[in-house]
């Protein structure tokens, strides 16, 4: 009876916390987690059944409290911190870890109790160690009134021992003694609770053997280094991301010194008024759902871009553009640098578009509505961090829709040459969270038809953001050139997959804008872009396109790789995607 009650409790608390303290959950995520938590809750009471524990014992209570603290802490604190500023988040690994850790502790207690009542000290110490993270997180929140994030984790990993000692001293001896004594007392209580509990004397040896096997299964599932539950929990995953960012940053910055030491850049057309070149990087936008590229849509999804596509003097829309990869990291680490599918350069050895712009005399600014540090953000963040100015909306108190990026343009100095990058969240899943509900109502967009329609709505909202960026930059910053390109595409009616599921995953929008003054000063570039409208392109050549639009000569730029050059050499048969594995020429086989 007691194992059944515990299973129901763990499932109810876990799923209840998941639904209440996560935002913008996709429909399939709700059902998926319901099934996962139900299966987990059943599995974790198996050790209790094997050890014939039919009543609430102190070890069971301790394990249950440990599990509950893990289930609740990160989700609640993250929600309290981000509910007003983030339209969606799905934190489910702490809940899964909390449920499974109950089974792991129960199995550990059962095994150690068979050896000796005193062996319960192992379980008590394990529980104390496991509680360090949630208790520390609660303490962090009580001091700073915010959930720990990369801004809080970075100082922890980038602090010398002497600085740590100085910080501890600043807290005051009373607080330090209270915290240390409290944790020692908690550890002693957990050890005492597990000390005297022994297994029933008539427990068969084979039940211990099965319990040991269950314990081994839980151990691998929870603690394996690469894909275990523990390394995917909120705080631990954040720690790993920040650690990896520091490692990557050191490599990238070390390589930067070598890259820039021999980088030469010369503008072909000097002089002219201060102006701005604007690059907008989209997210998960597939041109198949954009009216400006594919007019046969259920409703107009890109009203502004469609109108601009008719202005062929200033705008060039490239209808044969593809991404080089299907995920953000491999796509952007190529798009933003020399590295491409067509050379053997390493990311850390490659000059970036920011390097080129700065060397050409532009003041560089990067504004992002994406994450700052994480497995999906690191390469872009490393490039962004070399800008003269880099800011993320995650530090803003406003809701993080892409429209919030427009305000950054008001802070740019119009008296100097500027290169500005806006990195959108675009049409990243979950699509219905990419635009405000008020926007959908104001524009008469359908929101009741599922993922595909919500995806089209996100495309519509991105169109409005592009219009606002264009108008603001034109009015304030003497916009001379603008480029819009997505990192990769997407198939909104299919579950996301690391496998290649069709060319919609890589069909992306690409267009350029040139002002009258730019066309007058750079006629060859303007003619090349117009002449190359129907040429094939993969976005690992975006770096070369931007070099061409800057109209520079450089030892790290080959004009034959740039759509902005009459020497552009690539033909349809040359183009590759999915990290060199798929030929763009095969797109005819998957036109649907």
Protein language model regions, located:
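Substrate-binding rim/cap in mid-to-C-terminal beta-strand-loop elements of soluble/periplasmic
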Residues: 324-338, 498-552
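A structural signal for well-ordered alpha-helical segments within the folded catalytic domains
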Residues: 102, 162, 348-351, 355, ...
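Active-site-proximal alpha/beta segments of enzymes that process anionic O-linked groups
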Residues: 210-279, 284-443, 538-539, 544-569
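Transmembrane and membrane-interface helices of multi-pass
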Residues: 1-234
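Flexible internal linker/loop segments at domain or repeat junctions
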Residues: 436-450, 518-527
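A long, amphipathic alpha-helix that forms part
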Residues: 105, 264, 406-410, 443-482, ...
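Polar, surface-exposed loop/tail segments
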Residues: 305, 526-531, 550-589
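Histidine-centered active-site microenvironments of extracellular/periplasmic hydrolases
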Residues: 293-300, 474, 478-479, 483-523, ...
